[in-house]
Design a protein with these regions (language model features):
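A short, flexible beta-alpha/helix-coil linker loop
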Residues: 128-129, 173, 437-440
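Conserved adenylation A10 loop of the ANL superfamily
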Residues: 119-132, 244
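Active-site glycine/GP-rich loop and adjacent strand/helix microenvironment
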Residues: 2-75, 83-87, 98, 105-107, ...
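Short coil/turn connectors at secondary-structure junctions
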Residues: 161-164, 228-230
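N-terminal, positively charged nucleic-acid-binding surface of large information/translation enzymes
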Residues: 167-173
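Conserved beta-strand scaffold positions in the cores of enzyme catalytic domains, especially
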Residues: 131, 165-167, 339, 530
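Active-site diphosphate/adenylate-binding microenvironment
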Residues: 54-119, 131, 137, 148-156, ...
Length: 578
């Protein structure tokens, strides 16, 4: 039987003169220019200390006459010790009064910049959303970090270079402050700032972030992308990747009909002005492509990205922390496409830049922010906490990361726990473990989200299983407190299989967390228990959580450890535990 794998360019329409010109002429120039910047970045890892100090004292000097700078004595700070003495470690609450004035137009409360492009909104994974000013320095560092990431990925995968890119971005104009400054996702702003000739490489239009219905965004991405040899997909959260793949298979008949007829299914709800601008492109019929895809479906019965996009396509998404359960499902949908972690990046700024496939570790981005580290287990807010610079870290040790940024955050505890996995030159390589907030301690066991995800990953691997969304949560009982695994009824097929997963996780937690083992042996903790939930529960729960915190779908991370002790009892009262 002939293969229908999309390995031949003949399966896609000819790219056309303009796109060919981009790859040949513009592509060569960009590769040379950005490659030179990447080499400078990699070379700089040999001397991070002077770069970090120049960045720190540059920020202090620049903002010394702001109200925050005067209130905290920036002008008198001469050394790192002075800086740490004048400005204790803090969360967002310290800067919020100044930030509120910036939102009202009083920029000098916190920043010396006269221009604020927008406010980046946090993802809503902790409490409520926070606003982060995007000034020129923030934007330059943000774009430089992505350039370094992309150039290194293309250098390692030259077949993918300067070919169509599918990137999911958010809306940078979700709302507006009282002073008229837009608030939203930085990805939306940077998409609008790209040169038109470069934008032709992107499958989705720059304002696709304004599509609020996620199913419609997936459908449009597939409708436009099925006719192009997409060679890079960027969506920070791997759940987005899987949902995209599933959406394409679920809607394969509608997609092929649209490609054949030159239409867009009316269930795809996109803004009218966007639809009008895409009308000419959507009206093009693709009978040859439809014929090929029909052959794929006849052969396999399904239609996944591995069937319609080249195998040299690069998947850019998070791979660390709790992402393992999603990544194990990738081969089914994406075959052997390369996976490149996009790095530890948040609305507050980029922290790491990964440079290898299948490795969540990345180089500390020493040019974007000034970084400090507190050994995990110490309280970062304590005046006696140990604070280290990047070059002082120890390989194998875990740390809480602190940021001082161009956006007015100083010694800011972002609650991220990272592990130093080694060094490039003298600059640390860091992998994300979990949010410091995702930490449970019923009776001294100090269970982290990292413990949970590692136990689940290993249990699934040993049992030869896959898992959908899940969470572990503390379950209070006056006599036998314990932890529960909360999964939907169809997650593992049968209750017996789910119980095997629970039993294996219980053993692994005891092996990898000596405090958990001690509390189990002493009877202070009962064993992990199984809680089955109705199908669709987690999708609804995540949706409600996103709505409550006004989070961004593309940035959202489902918590694999829920720390509230009443989670199980609340579900039981609502009759949701089966």
């Amino acid at each position: 039987m002939p293969s229908h794998r999309p390995e031949f360019s003949a399966q896609f329409e000819h790219p056309g003169l303009i796109e060919a010109m981009i790859r040949s002429t513009v592509g060569k120039f960009l590769s040379w220019s950005l490659g030179r910047k990447l080499r400078r970045f990699l070379d700089s890892t040999n001397a991070p200390h002077p770069i970090q100090h120049a960045l720190l004292f540059g920020l202090l000097h620049k903002n010394r006459n702001t109200d925050f700078g005067r209130d905290h004595g920036f002008a008198g700070i001469q050394t790192l010790a002075d800086f740490r003495k004048r400005i204790p470690v803090a969360g967002y609450d310290r800067v919020e009064p100044y930030m509120a004035r910036v939102r009202q137009g009083d920029t000098k409360a916190l920043l010396s910049d006269k221009r604020i492009h927008m406010f980046a909104l946090t993802s809503g994974t902790t409490n409520t959303r926070k606003t982060i000013p995007v000034n020129d320095q923030y934007l330059d560092a943000y774009r430089a970090g992505w350039h370094n990431w992309g150039v290194k990925a293309y250098a390692d995968h030259p077949d993918a270079s300067m070919r169509p890119i599918l990137q999911f971005s958010g809306d940078w104009q979700e709302e507006t402050t009282s002073s008229g400054v837009p608030c939203g996702a930085v990805t939306g702003l940077t998409a609008t700032m790209q040169k038109r000739i470069v934008r032709r490489l992107y499958v989705l239009p720059s304002d696709s972030g304004k599509i609020k219905d996620i199913a419609s965004k997936y459908y449009l991405a597939l409708r436009l992308g099925l006719t192009r040899p997409v060679s890079m997909i960027i969506a920070a959260n791997p759940s987005t990747m899987i949902n995209l793949a599933r959406a394409g298979n679920d809607a394969k008949e509608d997609l092929l009909r649209d490609l054949c007829d030159g239409t867009l299914n009316p269930r795809c709800k996109i803004p009218a002005d966007l639809h009008a601008r895409l009308s000419r492109q959507l009206a093009i019929k693709h009978p040859a492509r439809v014929s090929h895809l029909e052959g794929v479906i006849r052969q396999s019965g399904t239609l996944y990205p591995k069937d319609y996009w080249p195998s040299h396509c690069i998947l850019g998404n998070w791979t660390g922390g709790s992402m393992g359960a999603y990544l194990r499902q990738y081969p089914r949908y994406f075959g052997n496409m390369a996976i490149r972690d996009v790095g530890l990046i948040a609305s507050e700024g980029r922290m790491t830049t990964p440079i290898e496939d299948n490795n969540s570790s990345g180089i500390l981005d020493i040019h974007s922010s000034f970084f400090e580290f507190v050994p995990n287990g110490e309280d970062p807010l304590s005046p006696t906490a140990t604070c280290l610079e990047g070059h002082e870290l120890i390989s194998g040790q875990e740390y809480r990361i602190l940021l001082t940024t161009a956006s007015g955050l100083y010694r800011y505890d972002i609650h991220d726990v990272v592990r130093c996995t080694g060094f490039m030159g003298r600059t640390p390589l860091l992998e994300f473990l979990n949010k410091g907030a995702y930490f449970s301690n019923l009776t001294g066991e100090k269970l982290s989200e990292h413990h949970v995800t590692r136990a689940m990953d290993r249990a699934l691997r040993e049992l030869g299983l896959e898992s959908g969304t899940y969470s572990v949560a503390p379950c209070w009982d006056d006599h036998h407190p314990n932890y529960g695994l909360f999964v939907e009824t169809t997650n593992f097929g049968t209750r017996d299989t789910a119980q095997k997963v629970v039993a294996r996780m219980e053993n692994i937690l005891a092996e990898t967390n000596i405090e958990y083992a001690s509390k189990r042996e002493s009877g202070r903790l009962a064993p992990l228990n199984l809680n089955l939930l109705p199908d669709g529960f987690w999708a609804n729960w995540d949706r409600e959580r996103l709505t409550k915190t006004r989070g961004v779908q593309e940035q959202y991370k489902h918590p694999c450890l829920i720390t509230t002790v009443d989670f199980q009892s609340d579900l039981a009262k609502r009759g949701l535990i089966i």
